[in-house]
Amino acid sequence: MKGILGKKVGMTQIFTDKGVVIPVTAVEAGPMVVTQIKTVDKDGYNAIQIGFEDAKEKALNKPKKGHLAAANVLKKHLKEFRVDSVEGYTVGQEIKADVFEAGAKIDVTGISKGKGFQGPIKRHGQSRGPETHGSRYHRRPGSMGACSYPGRVFKNKKLAGHMGSVKVTVQNLEVVKVDADKNLILVKGAIPGAKGSVVTIKEAIKVSK
């Protein structure tokens, strides 16, 4: 499976030859470096580990420095991707955005924007109560359940709580354009996370027919 790490730059729009507007998200994908290779004989499966975004030496602990010494790099983020074969990969090899091409279908994983503590209307899309005519029910969560039996609040009751800042995957997005020289990938539509957040881009596992 092909996969890379990238940093969300932001959203913009491009125009097709027919003048159709396409909203796209720009992702700075690379350059990355192969930091480790795993094989069936040694590890039980084939995989490559890649490092993304340069780090200062003082920001890394000794175990991580020792791990990255073979590739002779200092990287903040490490990610492992399983592959069918490790042929063609070497430790220290540079990987750029051109592993994907325009028209490819991808899955993008990132950490969603944190919204803090939110009520059931914003967090779950619950309907609100009337504003006027003597109503005292506006933005409250509603019934907690029966009184004497079962005498408790059921699990998964939609209540207020922490919203966002969770791992989210958006599937079957389309790569609109790849600029290998600038290490940019333009993805159709929105992807999870805030500007500057790190995202994982993989081949789509459920390709639309």
Curated annotation (Swiss-Prot):
Keywords: Ribonucleoprotein, Ribosomal protein, RNA-binding, rRNA-binding. Residues 117-142 are annotated as: Disordered. GO terms for molecular function: rRNA binding; structural constituent of ribosome. This is Large ribosomal subunit protein uL3. PROSITE patterns: RIBOSOMAL_L3. Part of the 50S ribosomal subunit. Forms a cluster with proteins L14 and L19. Belongs to the universal ribosomal protein uL3 family. It comes from the Bacteria. One of the primary rRNA binding proteins, it binds directly near the 3'-end of the 23S rRNA, where it nucleates assembly of the 50S subunit. InterPro entries: Ribosomal_uL3 (IPR000597), Ribosomal_uL3_bac/org-type (IPR019927), Ribosomal_uL3_CS (IPR019926), Transl_B-barrel_sf (IPR009000). GO terms for biological process: translation. One of its GO terms (cellular component) is cytosolic large ribosomal subunit.
